[in-house]
Each structure stands twice: as C-alpha cells, then as structure tokens.
C-alpha cells in the first residue's frame, strides 16, 4: 500500500461542527456551569467560581450570554462553551465538542 494511503474500509472520524455545538450549548450554559463548576454561583450575567476545578471563589468567570470565559488566577481563557468543556475536562476541543454534543443530543458528525 502506498505511503499515506488508507485501507478502503478504514473509517475516518468526521469533522465536528464546532459552531453548531456552541450554538446549541449557549442556551444551556448556566446549567452546564452548575454541573462543571459546582462551587460557583451566578452573579449578574456571569457564572463565577474559584477556578476551572469548580471550587468557590471569584477568580474564574463565564459570560453566560457569549460563552467567553477566563480563569484569571491560572491565566486560562476561551471564547465558547466547547473550549470551556475542554479546559474543565482536560481534553482536546474535538473530544469536548463530541461529548458536549452527546450531552445536548445534537448530531454534529456526518457519516461516510
């Protein structure tokens, strides 16, 4: 077989539609934050907690309208629910997007 070729029956994972997952997650972001960052609380339009580990405090903030977030103590930040899910779980963004899509019952992958 030629270098770089793949077996005819091999299946590649389809690309994830990050925009679709983020769009689906935004209306549920407060509930997701309650699950992922349980020591936090809502203050105005933000979910506020101590860090991405989810303890009480005010160093980590998630804008519930836009999905932008920052853990100011650790210097981590992101712009959407998928990046937040990835940071909280310590996984890659594609894996986080697939997991979040399953949680929200959103089909984001096309088949071959």
Predicted regions and their residues:
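N-terminal structured subdomain of primase-like DNA metabolism proteins
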Residues: 1-112
């Amino acid at each position: 077989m030629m270098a770089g070729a793949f077996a005819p029956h091999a299946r590649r994972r389809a690309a994830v539609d990050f925009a679709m997952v983020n769009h689906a997650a935004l209306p549920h972001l407060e509930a997701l934050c309650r699950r992922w960052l349980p020591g936090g609380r809502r203050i105005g339009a933000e979910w506020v907690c101590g860090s991405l580990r989810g303890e009480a405090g005010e160093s980590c903030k998630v804008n519930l309208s836009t999905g932008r977030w920052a853990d100011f103590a650790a210097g981590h930040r992101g712009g959407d629910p998928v990046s937040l899910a990835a940071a909280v779980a310590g996984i890659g963004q594609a894996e986080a997007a697939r997991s979040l899509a399953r949680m929200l019952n959103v089909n984001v992958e096309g088949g071959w």
